[in-house]
């Protein structure tokens, strides 16, 4: 057997994937592939050659976003929740290497379809040290199953034709039936590759793989964190050594696969026909998709895109041209942190906003900010701040509220960590396709007469958003569109109230009803302290009663139709809950390496009996735009003749990450933070309080502890994987914007207490 002839005969490129025209055709092709796999009697292995049927998720980045850390974690949670167990919760460390070879027939250099696989941290470390696979083979700890060579080939059907891979684009996974043949390191083919090892360029893939199994399903779930060879124009570049390939300095990617357990299927087992195996395959596919979409009711990605484009048409009007959707298209305005100057009485001719004038207050739930969108067919969806769509599994039959948009908090668990799945609405933007953003929030004036000619069933006749929101939720009456039948298949079910999704209207205490805003706050805080809310709360939200949504003037226009911060809306948290999201980078020495310091050098012992404590110093950065936030060094700009011009107003490149330099109180070292390194003798890492590893160019949420020594006041709480994935996808997400970070800094140092 020769490497190049087998490759020419059997390797299938991604361009030869089975073309699919309809969903029905795709399902039939899927079942056909499963049937052909079972006909091969996969329980039997011949000459170390086995059949392999796998399903890989997130294969087409044009259909859905690549799988990120949040998707990875959500799938793990879903697997555990559905009874899957890991073979090894720490996972296996695997290094896979493919070599280039010269095709003797054409003289061209090609990439082999045979890969070397090294398993185990000790063996991988030895390879990284030597770049010599023979030295790894010669190690005493090398066992026969720790290193091998594997050739994957496309399977053939009964007529000798290749069985092509199948892309199920609706849910963005690929079905692949292949044969896999292993060769030990002493085989002729392996020895031939080893003999040319140092003279051939290679592609590297380093991964941590955790395999999950289920007692009732003949299916493995493999989840992997992968780092590979450096890419150029998205194509991996072969190199001679793993160091030249820059494998470990690259960005992590995440892979999720299902693979059939050959030992449990085929002749003589309960899974001897395609229909039986397909039933369990569909269940496991649904489990993975539920994790990726954070929903019990995964939907096609085409449906998600349709929902987003329908949302945009409603918001932007009929003139809207279909475009790519970005997080900035979330129209719910954010809130500023409440400061002491916002609590004092309004000063004449001052531009400072006071919550004493026409404000109401509600509790801030510990949930995720989302929009609830009622589509033109009554289906109810949630849209998060990153414009990810989740189907709730519910719909409404009330046609007068189709094409409506609510703003609120999605609360997954109650305060006892039990499943809740509640949407607590706090604002309303569109009803039946018509904007109500222009209306005031609460009726703060004496009753006014309404037009008698307004159609009775049209709730837009009322002119206050909270009143409309309350009535819309009364009309909503969500019902489930699904019900599990006796054969465990999902069937449509009409007119059944949903036991899953709860939609409620949050309660607001108005200053006009309680005498003043302080009495309104006192009542709300009493309700919180008395445990009247079934969910966890972490503060208060103050909303102007008399202004349009996001607007700043009475009877004026509402706010912009993109992500923004509403200067008239405020949030209050107890000081200990005020945090800032920073983009972190480690201080470097003159050689470009991370600076590592030792506690004993400064005569300080942090952990008692530990002799030497090592730490790194971080530079904390936030997003800064000179057009909005001022100038970092205006005097130097003038000296350098770097003056602003009108063209700068439309310069999208002006938003950039800069070290955090707060103004009130000013602290020139506020952007520096020391982090203790944790780990074992050989590996030391920066960790958050939630025991999450983090590194350069990640966005991390920090709290500020006043009592800590200088340099140690910032404490990392958790990694913001959502924001980090946006940054690494090329978006301008650098943590909190400067004005938000500066506002929170001021609130941390001059906190407003519950009793003020």
Model feature map: region roles:
Residues 2-11:
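Compositionally biased low-complexity segments enriched in polar/charged residues
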Residues 46-48, 53-58, 134, 140, ...:
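Nucleic-acid 5′ end/cap handling module spanning
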Residues 221-223, 231-233, 266-269, 370-373, ...:
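Short helix/loop capping segments that flank catalytic or ligand/cofactor-binding pockets
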Residues 376-415:
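Conserved loop->alpha-helix
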């Amino acid at each position: 057997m020769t490497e190049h002839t087998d490759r020419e005969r059997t390797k299938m490129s991604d361009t030869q994937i089975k073309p699919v025209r309809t969903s029905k055709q795709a399902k039939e092709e899927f079942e056909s592939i499963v049937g052909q796999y079972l006909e091969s009697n996969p329980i039997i292995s011949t000459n170390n050659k086995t059949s392999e049927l796998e399903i890989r998720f997130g294969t087409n980045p044009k259909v859905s976003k690549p799988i990120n850390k949040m998707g990875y974690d959500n799938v793990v949670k879903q697997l555990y929740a559905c009874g899957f167990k890991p073979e090894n919760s720490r996972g296996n460390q695997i290094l896979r290497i493919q070599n280039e070879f010269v095709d003797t027939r054409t003289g061209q250099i090609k990439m082999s379809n045979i890969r070397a696989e090294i398993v185990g941290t000790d063996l991988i470390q030895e390879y990284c040290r030597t770049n010599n696979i023979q030295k790894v083979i010669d190690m005493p700890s090398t066992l026969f199953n720790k290193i091998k060579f594997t050739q994957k080939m496309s399977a053939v059907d009964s007529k000798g034709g290749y069985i092509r891979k199948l892309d199920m684009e609706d849910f963005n996974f690929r079905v692949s039936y292949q044969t896999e043949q292993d060769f030990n390191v002493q085989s002729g083919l392996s020895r031939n590759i080893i003999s040319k090892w140092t003279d051939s360029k290679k592609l590297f893939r380093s991964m941590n793989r955790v395999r999950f199994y289920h007692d009732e399903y003949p299916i493995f779930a493999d989840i992997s964190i992968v780092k590979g060879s450096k890419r150029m124009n998205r194509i991996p570049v072969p190199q001679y050594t793993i160091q030249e390939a820059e494998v470990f300095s690259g960005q992590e990617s995440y892979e999720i696969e299902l693979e059939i357990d050959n030992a449990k299927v085929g002749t003589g087992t309960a899974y001897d026909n395609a229909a039986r195996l397909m039933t369990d395959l569909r269940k496991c596919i649904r489990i993975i998709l539920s994790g990726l979409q954070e929903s019990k009711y995964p939907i096609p990605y085409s449906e998600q895109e349709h929902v987003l484009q329908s949302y945009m048409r409603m918001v932007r009007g009929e003139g809207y041209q279909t475009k790519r959707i970005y997080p900035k298209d979330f129209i719910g305005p954010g809130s500023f942190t409440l400061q002491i100057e916002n609590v004092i009485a309004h000063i004449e001719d001052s531009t400072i906003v006071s919550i004493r004038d026409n404000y109401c207050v509600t509790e801030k739930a510990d949930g995720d900010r989302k929009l609830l969108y009622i589509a033109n067919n009554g289906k109810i969806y949630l849209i998060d701040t990153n414009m990810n769509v989740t189907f709730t599994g519910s719909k409404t039959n009330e046609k007068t509220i189709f094409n409506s948009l609510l703003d609120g908090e999605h609360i997954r668990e109650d305060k006892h960590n039990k499943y809740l799945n509640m949407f607590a609405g706090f604002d309303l933007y569109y009803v039946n396709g018509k904007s109500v953003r222009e209306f005031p929030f609460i009726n703060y004036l004496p009753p006014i007469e309404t037009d008698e000619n307004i159609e009775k069933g049209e709730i837009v006749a009322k002119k206050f958003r909270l009143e409309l929101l309350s009535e819309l939720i009364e009309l909503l009456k969500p019902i489930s569109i699904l019900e599990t039948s006796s054969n465990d298949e999902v069937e449509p079910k009409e007119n059944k109230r949903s036991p899953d999704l709860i939609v409620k209207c949050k309660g607001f205490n108005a200053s006009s009803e309680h005498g003043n805003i302080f009495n309104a706050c006192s009542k709300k805080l009493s309700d919180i302290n008395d445990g009247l809310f079934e969910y966890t709360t972490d503060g208060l939200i103050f909303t102007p009663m008399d202004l349009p949504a996001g607007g700043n003037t009475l009877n004026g226009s509402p706010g912009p139709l993109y992500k923004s911060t509403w200067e008239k809306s405020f949030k209050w948290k107890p000081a200990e809950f005020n945090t800032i999201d920073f983009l972190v980078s480690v201080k470097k020495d003159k050689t470009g390496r991370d600076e590592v310091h030792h506690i004993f050098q400064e005569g300080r012992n942090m952990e008692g009996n530990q002799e030497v404590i090592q730490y790194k110093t971080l530079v904390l950065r936030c997003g800064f735009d000179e057009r909005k936030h001022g100038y970092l060094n205006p005097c130097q700009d003038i000296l350098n003749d770097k003056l602003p011009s009108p063209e700068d107003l439309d310069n999208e490149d002006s938003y950039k990450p800069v070290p955090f330099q707060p103004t009130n109180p000013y602290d020139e070292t506020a952007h520096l933070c020391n982090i203790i390194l944790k780990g074992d003798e050989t590996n030391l890492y920066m960790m958050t309080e939630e025991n999450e590893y983090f590194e350069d160019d990640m966005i991390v949420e920090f709290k500020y502890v006043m009592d800590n020594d200088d340099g140690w006041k910032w404490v990392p709480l958790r990694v913001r994987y959502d924001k980090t994935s946006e940054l690494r996808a090329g978006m301008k997400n650098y943590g909190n914007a400067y004005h938000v970070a500066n506002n929170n800094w001021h609130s941390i140092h001059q906190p407003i207490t519950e009793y003020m």
